[in-house]
């Protein structure tokens, strides 16, 4: 709170902020302007929002990389955006209720993550082949995705609105991420939303989300078939580039998956990372997944509203 007061050029006190939060008093125009500037949101946000964002989960999925004032700004933008989107959906008569098909699925191990990924694919009728657009799949299933510019090192966040509406925040800037990483980030945040994570001394929650994302994008059975067997002496750049362009999965993720399945030796895994991947983190020249990864729900709704107003 002290940081927010400082960012707002000290035009508001801690006591006043507390009263605003509890609805006891409303801020004056100059205070609204200063707070909106500090939080990088529209002044319209302070006209009121009835959306409750799960701030603890937003904090958790940031991995501790964001300061509280940055999280507060993201929360404000997310609440404002969500309320406007839901209002648009009501206007055009489009609903998007969400149901978690693997609710209470507990992931403690690599094998649990593989099973959860396979089960969700089966329940969502994805088969075991490539998923053309991960973002469009998530939107179709009722998950709202907001585009936002996130700080360095943070590619995505996830949380709930009113304890019923799943939200994912993604940074889609091409100079920051690759399409393959974007797909992986979306699947990683999906894990945070759908799965339960009992305490585990072996795998952190973030690593378990990574395992789920990897095997959701490239299922174990398909990966083994594409690689021609359960064990390989070495993996070649040419074959993984081909699979990257087909499955939308990075070279790095494929090498990780091969090691997770003990398809390759630790020595070969280390060679790939130390001599190749660490030297080319954006994987330039190693193929590109060309199917567009975009969000489209709000754009389609806006087109319907525009037509209604003509």
Q: At which residue positions do the language-model features occur?
A:
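Active-site hotspot residues in diverse enzymes, especially metal/ion-binding acidic/histidine motifs
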Residues: 1-310
């Amino acid at each position: 709170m002290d940081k927010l007061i400082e960012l707002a050029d000290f035009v508001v006190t801690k006591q006043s902020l507390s009263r605003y939060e509890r609805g006891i008093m409303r801020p004056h125009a100059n205070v609204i302007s200063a707070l909106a500037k500090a939080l990088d949101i529209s002044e319209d946000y302070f006209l009121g929002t009835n959306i409750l964002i799960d701030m603890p989960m937003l904090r958790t999925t940031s991995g501790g990389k964001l300061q509280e004032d940055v999280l507060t700004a993201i929360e404000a933008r997310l609440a404002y955006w969500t309320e406007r989107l839901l209002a648009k959906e009501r206007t055009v008569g489009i609903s998007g209720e969400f149901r978690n098909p693997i609710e209470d699925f507990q992931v403690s191990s690599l094998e649990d993550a593989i099973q959860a990924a396979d089960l969700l694919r089966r329940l969502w009728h994805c088969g075991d082949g490539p998923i053309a657009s991960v973002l469009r799949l998530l939107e179709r299933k009722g998950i709202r995705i907001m585009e936002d510019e996130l700080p360095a090192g943070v590619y995505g966040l996830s949380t709930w609105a009113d304890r019923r509406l799943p939200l994912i925040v993604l940074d889609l800037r091409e100079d920051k991420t690759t399409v393959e990483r974007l797909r992986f980030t979306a699947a990683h945040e999906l894990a945070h939303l759908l799965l339960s994570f009992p305490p585990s001394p072996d795998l952190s929650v973030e690593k378990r989300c990574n395992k789920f994302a990897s095997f959701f994008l490239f299922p174990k059975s398909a990966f083994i078939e594409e690689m021609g067997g359960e064990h390989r002496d070495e993996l070649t750049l040419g074959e993984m580039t081909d699979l990257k362009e087909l499955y939308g999965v990075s070279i790095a993720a494929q090498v990780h998956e091969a090691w997770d399945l003990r398809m390759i030796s630790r020595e070969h895994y280390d060679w790939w990372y130390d001599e190749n991947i660490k030297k080319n983190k954006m994987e330039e020249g190693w193929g590109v997944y060309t199917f567009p990864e975009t969000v489209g729900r709000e754009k389609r709704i806006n087109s319907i509203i525009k037509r209604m107003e003509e």
